């Protein structure tokens, strides 16, 4: 293959770089005349005594150039003065030895050889061109059968295969010269050469037009695409067969002599030697007129040797080297993590870098890091040498180096001078997001460890337990400038993923600040005194320090002068003309708070500190915020030291009610066990109920313990409470294990062990309890190791799919939008609207509801936090915003559709790599979460809410609910989709409320989605009050409820076939269970109005696994339970389930046991059973149109006969297939579904990611369309093309008066989308390297080097950040006009790399 950079009509930059790269198949002339510097005839490498290359061998100096600079092989010519002379004795050109890295050679083959990539890589290119199967080709290429090339006078067909016997038979019958049949590479070459591709293309297009079968059309379209590639490019099909093999330059496959006469060599040399040996042997036996059988065998062996060289192991067994290890062929050199692309081109080792252990540097400023002197000396050596020479201290580099080694005093002075204003980059692996590399001003320190500012640890995810960091020195002025302007730690205090501060105090700092700001615990009135009043802050501080610093430990005693005040004493102080009741601690804290934020007079847990930092940035800007952060750090550490908080065993209180609650729980469990023994419930239900009881106990004791330790004694805080409440360390779950009970444990498979650990760590665990708990704890550790790799791979795929999404323009001018609402679960608002719309561009004018004169946001505005608050307060439910999903930029996305850059709160700049930021934002928490599972030590985290309690007064309204009144007078829900709303009591009728709710004319105060089997305790339209129980949820079973009175008749409940009677092991009671069966049976319970069973009033399908609760002929009333389907055993939910779910969504995989969804709006009906599947029909009542669904009997239906369903609504349990949503509901619904589902996984873990990042990934998954009708365009049926390409081709066709193509959108998984990228270099470096390169070469693809990866690989500057086109043009212009202005401009640039 060849690649060439086109320089035609291209304005080259001063480096002379090319702007595009083309790949194609190399012809024999190219290999011989353009690439090769000579033919290799011998397999020898180097002489074992002299270590000099053998002449004509694989390392020949005559062909590849000299091994020593400016010296020929025989030594006749030495030194540079003979440059360019070719030695007349040895034939070696006198030049630099580095030409041995560039010069290639070739091996002249004795017989034509087929290139394995074009024949064996699927789809087989040769097979497609010739219209032959891969197995037929294999038999021809490996000399097993002949193929007819020209039938001549015979009755044979062209391309017919003949074995030896048939071949001899034809010769006997027709004579040797009457036809042409060959085998091996020669046969393939002749066939390819004789193929008229132009007429073949025409023929295929005709066939494609006439064929009606979808499968045949797809097959033809694939072949057509390959043929079209050859026709439209300069490639010839016969070039896929080789006449000569190119040989890689010798310095790229080195041979190094080791001690003891052995050699270390590249595997390629062994593979080349095999080819040369077999080739020479074949040449020799061809000269000797050897029997055909031997020649054929030798030819096959040569073909196999060349196959092994190109792709070892692709055909047959791989060739083994020493130690029975497969040799690495040319393909392996490119593939995988250690291949050329990923090892040498995308990731390079860096000079001017160091690495050391990190320790905390609390004395540092935010923009500083402590650099060990010895390390700095080594890193900045060239700079020191230059400065020493400039000063005249030394005159040569050697003497300067000696001076540095001696450690002369002037060297240290020079070093101090040099590092002023020269930033260094610190990096901690793994670099999961862009905050993993930041720039700092170095400060020289003694010792050997790097010192790091405590506040940047969160960004690096670093701690001081032996972590190491790497230091890199930016060398060029541009690099230093970018580091200073864009990468300094103070510029990176917010997370690009959510806009939340990342540089927030933690651990001791939080504790110190929280302690200082704690609520008053010393009240003078309790000690017979009065509240002290101070005229200003200075007086408070004087009293605080002059009278001795009093706190918990001094027990509130005064010194002799009586002047001391307690740090948590209740005092009054005049601030800005107002008398405020506060504590001296809070006064002390407010000294460092910027005036604009006002007086902070409340406790300060970590969450509130974070909010304060954000507020500070918005009000006073970055510089003041960084100063504030540094002050926070200092104050936090000082106060934590002074507070001297420590934890004693007695601080862990055990709730007094523990024994009582445990006794109750054991009684409840005993009742459940008895129910099971009596056969009322199944074993599964017993397990579920037991777990629910213990979960409730766990939560109850946890809350009781928290209340207990939070009770403040007169002048004492519980240190444990301080640590947890401040957010410094620990959480409620850990506290529960210390003082209440460890609770339920999980087995390694995620199932919960029924018997909980009722002891806590203060009491100590029994041996049995300890062994149970070690189960789950070990799972956590094992998961961490395994899942980190998965998460890293997910991040890599995300980066690959989104890497070329760059901000390319300010505004694309689109009118498209998406609609956004707050995210709710029941009545609880999980994510308010203001958080979702902040930083997004609105695509319509937004007015105050009911007041058109008050404009809240104008079309095209980027919503600020103040506007977001206003919109949310106005009670607006949904808003139309612009999104990257609807952006119409030709390449990348526009700034308006993206919105604010969350890392700095400004509109995103041109050239910003938003795709990579999105991938990092989604990938980084994945890794964090996988690492976080074990902190709970396998605690079972189950969710159970057995009742619904309303939080407000109002009227209860049922919407979309089918209910039946049960025997107890309560309402039982019969359908899956519906909700109960609580609305404000405005004295309207129930019908009015329902109508207003359905048209969204009024807002409900609370909404609770309810499902099948929920018992509603309040009637439709009745009044409710806050705190009232309004519904009960059945957690353990999915009930099947009767809604009409009558008599039971079993239908298709045939014992032994569709049902079985199972005797309970413990009770001996017999239960009727519906089982999975293969017969044409439809198990259901029919209800008849009379005992004679003549008039049918209703039927109820019973899914397999359900337990029938009624007898045949039994009289039933509405609300009675007919059968129950036990829910699966509860498993713990952690990101272990979450990460694969994210991967499943972004890879667009079909979920296991997927749900069926309705294809049209209509009413549900059943039509019996067919082949173990239930036939469910959705009928449109207006048009009468029907859609049939075949649903396996094992699946649980969540709709019933007569239910109204909407298009896209689930009919059965399970996860929805995203491709079906696309097909049925369209692109918008799919986008919404994917974004919400991905967010759901992260939200469960408490991880905040902005929607815009997920939207970018989803955008990349929907970049392609599939052609359904090519019209008059050049597109092919079934071809998947980029939307941009599709629209451009249609536009061109319409302009020419042709018929445009029709297409449907396609959802691709991120791996497939990455491989389908326009850049073949980027795709090849990701996965499937050989297939991607073969594909690109066959159709002579051109890579225009528009993305990041391809530019990194080619060694160009990336087209993003300061390398973005617009910025580069300005820079070049400035260089011409006024060179000194370049740097001013770049520093003002708002772009970020």
Curated annotation (Swiss-Prot):
EC annotation from Swiss-Prot or TrEMBL: 2.7.7.6
InterPro entries: DNA-dir_RpoC_beta_prime, DNA-dir_RpoC_beta_prime_bact, RNA_pol_asu, RNA_pol_N, RNA_pol_Rpb1_1, RNA_pol_Rpb1_3, RNA_pol_Rpb1_3_sf, RNA_pol_Rpb1_4
Name of the protein this chain belongs to: DNA-directed RNA polymerase subunit beta'
Ligand binding (Zn(2+) 2): 812, 887, 894, 897
GO CC annotation: DNA-directed RNA polymerase complex
Gene3D superfamilies: 1.10.132.30, 1.10.150.390, 1.10.1790.20, 1.10.40.90, 2.40.40.20, 2.40.50.100, RNA polymerase II, clamp domain, RNA polymerase Rpb1, domain 3
Reaction equations catalysed: RNA(n) + a ribonucleoside 5'-triphosphate = RNA(n+1) + diphosphate
SUBUNIT field: The RNAP catalytic core consists of 2 alpha, 1 beta, 1 beta' and 1 omega subunit. When a sigma factor is associated with the core the holoenzyme is formed, which can initiate transcription.
Chain residues that bind Mg(2+): 463, 465, 467
Coiled-coil boundaries: none
Binding site for Zn(2+) 1: 72, 74, 87, 90
């Amino acid at each position: 293959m060849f690649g060439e950079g086109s320089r035609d009509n291209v304005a080259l930059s001063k480096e002379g770089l090319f702007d595009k790269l083309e790949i194609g198949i190399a012809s024999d002339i190219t290999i011989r005349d353009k690439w090769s510097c000579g033919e290799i005839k011998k397999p020898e490498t180097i002489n074992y005594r002299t270590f000099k290359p053998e002449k004509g061998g694989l390392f020949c100096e005559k062909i590849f150039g000299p091994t020593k600079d400016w010296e020929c092989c025989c030594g006749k010519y030495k030194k540079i003065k003979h440059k360019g002379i070719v030695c007349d004795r040895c034939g070696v050109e006198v030049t630099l030895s580095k030409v041995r890295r560039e010069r290639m050679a070739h091996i002249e083959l004795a017989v034509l050889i087929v290139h394995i990539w074009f024949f064996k890589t699927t789809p087989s290119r040769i097979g497609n061109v010739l219209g032959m199967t891969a197995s037929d080709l294999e038999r021809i290429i490996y000399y097993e059968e002949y193929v007819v090339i020209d039938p001549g006078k015979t009755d044979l067909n062209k391309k017919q295969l003949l074995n030896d016997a048939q071949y001899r038979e034809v010769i006997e019958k027709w004579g040797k010269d009457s036809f042409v049949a060959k085998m091996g590479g020669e046969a393939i070459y002749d066939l390819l050469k004789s193929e008229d591709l132009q007429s073949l293309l025409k023929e295929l297009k005709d066939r494609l037009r006439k064929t009606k079968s979808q499968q045949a059309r797809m097959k033809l379209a694939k072949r057509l695409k390959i043929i079209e590639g050859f026709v439209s490019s300069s490639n010839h099909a016969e070039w896929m067969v080789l006449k000569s093999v190119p040989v890689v330059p010798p310095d790229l496959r080195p041979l190094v002599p080791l001690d003891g006469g052995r050699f270390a060599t590249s595997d390629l040399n062994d593979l080349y030697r095999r080819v040369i040996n077999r080739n020479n042997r074949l040449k020799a036996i061809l000269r000797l007129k050897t029997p055909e059988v031997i020649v054929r065998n030798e030819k096959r062996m040569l073909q196999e040797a060349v196959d092994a060289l190109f792709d070892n192991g692709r055909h047959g067994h791989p060739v083994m080297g020493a130690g029975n290890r497969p040799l690495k062929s040319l393909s392996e050199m490119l593939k995988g993590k250690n291949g050329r692309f990923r090892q040498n081109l995308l990731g390079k080792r860096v000079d001017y870098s160091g690495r050391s252990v990190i320790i905390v540097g609390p004395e540092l400023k935010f923009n500083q890091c402590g650099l060990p002197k010895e390390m700095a000396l080594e890193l900045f050596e060239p700079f020191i040498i230059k400065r020493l020479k400039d000063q005249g201290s030394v005159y040569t580099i050697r003497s300067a180096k000696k001076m540095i080694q001696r450690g002369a005093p002037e060297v240290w002075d020079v070093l101090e001078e040099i590092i002023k204003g020269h930033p260094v980059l610190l990096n901690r692996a793994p670099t999961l997001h862009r905050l993993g590399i930041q720039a700092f001003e170095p400060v020289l320190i003694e010792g050997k460890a790097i010192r790091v500012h405590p506040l940047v640890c969160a960004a690096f995810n670093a701690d001081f337990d032996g972590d190491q960091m790497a230091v890199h020195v930016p060398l060029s002025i541009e690099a230093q400038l970018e580091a200073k302007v864009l990468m300094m730690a103070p510029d990176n205090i917010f997370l690009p993923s959510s806009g939340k501060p990342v540089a927030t105090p933690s651990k001791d700092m939080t504790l110190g600040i929280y302690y200082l700001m704690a609520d008053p615990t010393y009240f003078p009135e309790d000690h017979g005194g009065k509240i002290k009043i101070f005229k200003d802050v200075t007086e408070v501080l004087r009293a605080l320090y002059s009278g001795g610093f009093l706190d918990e430990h001094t027990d509130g005693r005064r010194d002799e002068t009586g002047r001391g005040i307690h740090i948590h004493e209740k005092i009054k102080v005049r601030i800005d003309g107002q008398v405020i009741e506060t504590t001296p601690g809070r006064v002390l804290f407010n000294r460092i708070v910027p005036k604009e934020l006002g007086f902070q007079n409340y406790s300060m847990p970590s969450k509130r500190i974070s909010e304060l930092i954000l507020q500070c940035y918005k009000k006073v800007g970055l510089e003041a915020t960084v100063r504030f952060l540094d002050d926070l750090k200092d104050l936090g550490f000082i106060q934590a030291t002074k507070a001297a908080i420590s934890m004693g065993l007695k601080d862990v209180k055990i709730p007094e009610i523990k024994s009582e609650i445990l006794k109750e729980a054991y009684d409840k469990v005993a009742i459940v066990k008895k129910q099971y023994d009596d056969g009322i419930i199944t074993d599964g239900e017993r397990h579920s109920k037991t777990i629910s009881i213990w979960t409730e106990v766990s939560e109850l004791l946890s809350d009781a313990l928290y209340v207990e330790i939070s009770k403040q004694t007169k002048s004492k805080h519980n240190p444990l409470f301080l640590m947890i409440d401040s957010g410094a360390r620990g959480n409620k779950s850990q506290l529960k294990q210390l003082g209440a009970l460890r609770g339920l444990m999980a087995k390694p498979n995620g199932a919960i062990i029924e018997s909980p650990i009722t002891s806590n760590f203060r009491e100590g665990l029994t041996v049995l309890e300890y062994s149970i708990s070690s189960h789950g704890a070990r799972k956590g550790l094992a998961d961490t190791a395994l899942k980190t790799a998965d998460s890293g791979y997910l991040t890599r795929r995300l980066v690959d799919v989104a890497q070329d999404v760059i901000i390319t323009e300010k505004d694309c001018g689109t009118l498209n939008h998406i609609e956004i609402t707050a995210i709710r679960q029941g009545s609880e608002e999980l994510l308010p609207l203001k958080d979702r719309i902040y930083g997004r561009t609105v695509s319509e004018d937004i007015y105050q509801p009911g007041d058109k004169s008050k404009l809240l946001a104008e079309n095209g505005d980027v919503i600020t936090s103040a506007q977001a608050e206003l919109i949310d307060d106005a009670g607006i439910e949904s808003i139309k915003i612009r999104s990257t999903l609807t952006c119409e930029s030709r390449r990348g996305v526009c700034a308006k559709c993206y919105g604010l850059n969350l890392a700095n709160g400004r509109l995103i700049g041109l050239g910003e790599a938003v795709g990579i930021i999105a991938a990092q934002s989604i990938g980084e928490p994945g890794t964090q979460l996988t690492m976080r599972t074990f902190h709970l030590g396998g605690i079972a985290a189950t969710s159970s809410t057995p009742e619904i309690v309303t939080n407000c007064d109002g009227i209860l309204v049922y919407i979309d609910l089918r209910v039946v009144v049960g025997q107890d007078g309560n309402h039982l829900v019969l359908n899956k989709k519906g909700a109960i709303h609580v609305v404000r009591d405005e004295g309207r009728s129930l019908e009015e409320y329902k109508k207003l709710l359905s048209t969204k004319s009024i807002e409900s105060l609370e909404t609770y989605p309810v499902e099948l089997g929920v018992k509603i305790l309040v009637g439709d339209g009745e009044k409710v009050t806050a705190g009232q129980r309004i519904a009960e949820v059945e957690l353990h079973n999915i009930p099947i409820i009767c809604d009409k009175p009558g008599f039971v008749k079993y239908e298709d409940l045939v014992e032994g076939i569709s049902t079985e009677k199972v005797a309970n092991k413990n009770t001996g009671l017999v239960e009727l269970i519906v089982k999975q069966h293969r017969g044409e049976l439809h198990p259901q319970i029919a209800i008849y109005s009379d005992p004679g069973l003549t008039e049918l009033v209703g039927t109820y399908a019973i899914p397999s696994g359900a337990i029938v609760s009624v007898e045949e002929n039994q009289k039933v009333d509405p609300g009675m339970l007919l059968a129950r389907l036990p829910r699966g055993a509860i498993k713990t939910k952690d990101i272990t389930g979450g990460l694969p779910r994210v991967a499943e969504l972004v890879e667009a995989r079909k979920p296991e046991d997927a749900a069926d969804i309705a294809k049209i709006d209509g009413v549900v009906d059943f039509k019996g059973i067919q082949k173990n599947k239930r036939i469910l029909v959705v009928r449109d009542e207006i048009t009468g149109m029907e859609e049939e669904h075949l649903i396996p009997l094992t699946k649980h239906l969540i709709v019933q006969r007569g239910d109204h369903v909407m298009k896209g609504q689930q009919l059965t349990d399970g996860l929805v297939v995203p491709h079906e949503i696309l097909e049925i509901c369209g692109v918008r619904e799919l986008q919404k579904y994917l974004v919400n589902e991905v967010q759901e996984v992260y939200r469960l873990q408490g991880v905040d990611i902005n929607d815009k990042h997920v939207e970018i990934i989803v955008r990349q998954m929907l970049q392609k369309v599939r052609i359904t009708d090519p019209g008059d365009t050049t597109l092919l049926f079934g071809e998947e093309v980029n939307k941009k390409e599709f629209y451009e081709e249609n536009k061109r066709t319409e302009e020419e008066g042709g018929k445009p193509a029709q297409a449907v959108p396609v959802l691709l998984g991120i791996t497939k989308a990455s491989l389908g990228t326009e850049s073949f270099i980027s795709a090849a470096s990701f996965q499937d390297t050989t297939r991607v390169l073969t594909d690109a070469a066959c159709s002579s693809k051109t890579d225009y080097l528009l993305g990041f990866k391809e530019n990194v690989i080619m060694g160009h500057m990336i087209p993003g950040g300061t390398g973005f086109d617009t910025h580069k043009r300005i820079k070049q212009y400035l260089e011409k006009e006024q060179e000194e202005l370049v740097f001013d401009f770049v520093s003002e640039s708002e772009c970020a790399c």
